[in-house]
């Protein structure tokens, strides 16, 4: 069963374009390491400083492998650097879920 990972970002509302670019960098990277990216969700109505992302890996162990490998991958390092340079988000929190479906 796939392990969903939910990210909640606190954004700098003046840097939504930069954050959108940052998010788009991660789609191929998550998939490169065996995950499925389900999208970034940017502010539309309501709070203008919160964004969400959802992706999943076949297991928590595979997610942990992705995390370790991302710290040595040139494209991942470039994405981390972009976020650091643009300061497009202030903070984020990561939560793991288990899906529940109807019987």
Regions found by a protein language model. Give the residues of each.
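Active-site-flanking beta-strand signature of metal-NTP-handling nucleotidyl enzymes
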Residues: 2-9, 52
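Short acidic/polar alpha-helix capping motifs at helix-coil junctions
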Residues: 3, 16-17, 29
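Short beta-strand-to-loop capping motifs
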Residues: 8-12, 55-59
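Short, surface-exposed ligand-recognition loops at beta-strand->loop->(often short) alpha-helix junctions
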Residues: 10-21
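Short, solvent-exposed loop/turn elements at beta->coil junctions and helix N-caps
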Residues: 40-43
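Short acidic/glycine-enriched loop/turn segments that link adjacent beta-strands
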Residues: 46-49
């Amino acid at each position: 069963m796939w392990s969903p990972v939910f990210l909640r970002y606190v954004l700098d509302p003046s840097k939504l374009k930069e954050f959108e670019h940052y998010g788009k960098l991660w789609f191929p990277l998550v998939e490169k390491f065996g995950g499925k990216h389900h999208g970034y969700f940017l502010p539309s109505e309501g709070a203008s400083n919160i964004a969400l992302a959802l992706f999943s890996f076949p297991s928590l162990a595979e997610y942990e492998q992705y995390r370790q490998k991302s710290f040595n991958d040139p494209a991942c390092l470039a994405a981390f650097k972009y976020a650091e340079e643009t300061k497009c988000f202030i903070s984020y929190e990561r939560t793991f879920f288990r899906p529940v479906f109807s019987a």
